[in-house]
Amino acid sequence: MSKPIRIGMVAGEPSGDILAAGMVAELKRQYPDAIIEGIGGPNMIDAGFHSLFDMETLSVMGLVEVLAHLPAILKVKKQLLAHFEQNPPDIFVGVDAPDFNLRVEKALKARGIKTMHYVSPTVWAWREKRIHKIAKAANRVLGLFPFEQQVYDKYHVPYTFVGHTMADAIAIEPDQNAARQELGVESNAYVLAVLPGSRRGEVETLLPVFLETIEAIHVKRSDIQFLIPAANEHRLAQIKAFLQEANNAEERLPIQVTQGTSRDAMIASDVILLASGTATLEAMLCKRPMVAAYLLSPLTYKIMQRLYKAPFFTLPNLLANEAIIPELLQEEVNAENMSNQLLNFFESDNSALIARFTDLHHTLKCNADKTAAKAVVEELFA
């Protein structure tokens, strides 16, 4: 009897856990006896993955936090590589977390193990030369966005576009009434969803100016309601505390704060104000006009001005290769500017923009879990 296939895999954060879980489920469906092990989160484990270490060890953000956790991270890397030396996988797939995974991939590739990297680092936007490091680490890159292909072709690095799991999960025509019922919002209400980010620092920076924007809109259009979905219980407490300090804003303005319902809030809304990031992709897939904003520290902004090469910083504009949504940075992020742009969406026919969002949704809807699993199997037997 032939021995089961062994697949090594590492996801370093919750987004990677969600992304990898569907691929793990698909691989287990095709090869029920396959041993898929490494580091993963609860979604991967539910799909049949064996996690050797707690994913939380790798889930750290920011330079200072990473430095504080570095000894623990290096210890995990050493133990993981020792495990794979004793139990060599037939193929290894690093899911995002490039700082950790590219090092693991390079070490395994040097031992003759096939390696893949799922989710391209942002080489198309800045530090393009990182692609040489990727080429040394991975036999093939699996990417989420079609515009990435160009830079990999330029350096002759094998790349497969697999689409985005979020595009598979969200309906082409999301049900606004169902989302409104879920959140207790009237079917005929005018609604602005406000998403100031999922990290403490983002909320701290953006919520004050977002609240000023809400107040500016309320002066002109008192019939508009505001939904603020908090990413988790920590952000919920942070948002509620800020609104209370801001002259009890939740009571004096038509604001509803919820937790863990960002997609419902997006679908329930007519227009969205949000922090730039993956949320802009989700808003696009929900077919809602949006204004995206971001504030960087002056030093970070100066550095990024020199290093950042892409023409846009929001995913809808990068995917469309033109400015289809307003993306605002630094001094552009002010209440007057944002309230005017948002009110313009409320008072305009947005059907052409929605049609563009729909086209882009179809581009990304490729059954990513199956496509990624197929690419892994093809590489495994190549």
Swiss-Prot record:
The UniProt record lists the keyword Transferase: yes
Alphabetized NCBIfam families for the sequence: lpxB (TIGR00215)
Q: Which reaction is recorded as catalysed by this protein?
A: a lipid X + a UDP-2-N,3-O-bis[(3R)-3-hydroxyacyl]-alpha-D-glucosamine = a lipid A disaccharide + UDP + H(+)
Key words of the record: Glycosyltransferase, Lipid A biosynthesis, Lipid biosynthesis, Lipid metabolism, Transferase
- What's the domain of life for this entry? Bacteria
Catalytic EC class: transferase
- Name-wise, this protein is Lipid-A-disaccharide synthase
Output the Gene Ontology terms for molecular function.
lipid-A-disaccharide synthase activity; phospholipid binding
Q: What's the Enzyme Commission number for this chain?
A: 2.4.1.182
> Which family does the record claim for this protein?
Belongs to the LpxB family.
The record's InterPro entries line, in alphabetical order, gives: Glyco_trans_19
Purpose of the protein: Condensation of UDP-2,3-diacylglucosamine and 2,3-diacylglucosamine-1-phosphate to form lipid A disaccharide, a precursor of lipid A, a phosphorylated glycolipid that anchors the lipopolysaccharide to the outer membrane of the cell.
Q: What pathway annotation does it carry? A: Bacterial outer membrane biogenesis; LPS lipid A biosynthesis
